């Protein structure tokens, strides 16, 4: 199954100093691990705010959420999940009925 998450950094609740190089670096490293494991399939940086959109692939929603919740910024409370939705194949590419 695939899932789409959109997150934003909680810059309204935390000062810039809260986003330490260690946390931000750890975030990038963890996303690379999840990508190498085939769980994070695609990652985009948001152009309108700090945060990301991530396409996840997992056997269940619980597995995808666990991967998302393993991110250092999420664990530190610095990341808000704005959208988390399950996806299904687009029917328009299938046979016409």
Where are these regions (language model features)?
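Conserved, structured core segments of small domains
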Residues: 1-97
